């Protein structure tokens, strides 16, 4: 299983990729963690805050397409070095940018840097042990470590002085430079990407019901995921339900539970039918989200956060497994599923912001409850269809 680690270059590639993906987790969570401080310091309203969180998702999606095209032209290493420059640059924009344009550009660039790193690391790590789930699960576990570490770091930094959030931005500039150096030192083989057979499989997937069921399930899941991750801390602070430090810690708890949920789902998927597992997780996100937004005490808020994070952890990969057959038959299907589903993570933060501007952050976050209910309906529809059609679920 670990034979590739005997090769010095592959060992370096393994270690460096795991390190930069942990940093990528810090980058991803910094968006929601820093948002309350940025709103206060820059005097921005809920509507604009929702817009810049959405721009992070836009940047992430753009990177998925542009990074792939660029590495085919200039090579994988030069491509990732170019895109990773936006990591440090985005935080410099946050630090020194005093108008909304610079903030919008900063959040967009954090998404670009995150998306490019995600594409690169997943591809390179998979190349070390093709088809081995443990190496990809390990990579995403490192992402979760970075994700729950940043809110804790920010809490410690701002415990005595809220203005210290700006120091966290300077630290992220340094970490961004460190990640660029790690990419520079990576021994990348087969730097040029080979062109794949164009148009293989065609667009026949548009006639397949499972395409729409999988896409719908992922769309509403990503609506809920980015809506909660982007606005959770602001919701707790602005409603007065939790202190600033406790709000940051809740974000860390969410990601600890996502990590635990991913590990458990990977184990249970070999023992429990994925159809049943997906429905259980769908019911879980509905129950625990309703518990979360209706709770006013720390104990029940914590219970809601833990249950929601644990339940949502396996929905994305399990849903993707249902689409394995159509992706194998129509390779282009995955690009369309990913693109359409990702629109959910772009749209929802802005919707929450618009509602919060008019009615308050409470009703804004309550809108996510509608989304998780629709997602549950999509999940049930997907499972019923697959059982009727006798679809084989790829592992």
Q: For the regions a protein language model found, what residue spans apply to each?
A:
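C-terminal transmembrane helical hairpin of 12-TM major facilitator-type secondary transporters
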Residues: 272-319
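Extracytoplasmic gate region of multi-pass secondary transporters
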Residues: 31-32, 209-252, 256-259
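Conserved MFS/SLC helix-loop-helix module at the cytosolic interface between two early adjacent transmembrane helices
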Residues: 62-100
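Cytoplasmic helix-loop-helix junction between adjacent transmembrane helices
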Residues: 106-141
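Helix-loop-helix hairpin linking two adjacent transmembrane segments in secondary transporters
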Residues: 132, 138-188
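Helix-to-loop junctions at the C-terminal end of transmembrane segments
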Residues: 63-75, 261-273, 356-357
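Residue-level signature of mid-helix packing/kink "hotspots" within the transmembrane helices
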Residues: 29, 56-65, 148, 255-263, ...
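Helix-breaking motifs and short loop linkers at transmembrane-helix boundaries and internal kinks
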Residues: 43, 75, 96-101, 130, ...
